[in-house]
Amino acid sequence: TVIVNGVSKTYAMTGWRIGWLAAPKEVAKAIDSFQSHATSNPASVSQYAALAALNGSEDELIKMRDIFNDRRKFMIERIRRIEGLGCIEPDGAFYIMLVVDKLYGKRFNGRKINGSLDVADMLLEKGVAVVPGIAFGDDECVRLSYAISKEDIAAGLDRIEEFVKEVF
């Protein structure tokens, strides 16, 4: 068993680049050898910040988890009301895969929608930034984030619904 984790999502410390690995000794040695050639050490301030997060109270984590869970539920319920779309409920992180394949073959502003790249480009024209699912090996989806305010989520989903209505 190999376990890899970090502080990015749990402690909202994206960009700090602090992570760890637990593995059998021979596997850990091989990974250490590779890692030492691939990256350098994280800054000491990042290491101390991670240590403080790991040793600190979990009260803020619980609040943050509840806020993200509320946003996730809100987003899923709102997506389910948009005809022609679906979503894959996430098990972790703060992303939802929006299923958009029913839009394929249809047109938006005279252009044919062939895949998730097209949907992402067209949604950007509507002021909504998404990541094409093809980047994750699933061209039937685009990825949405709920690491933003509930108000911004609602506004983005309103724009997505408007886009879908224009397509259908």
Which residues does each predicted region cover?
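PLP-dependent class I/II
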Residues: 1-168
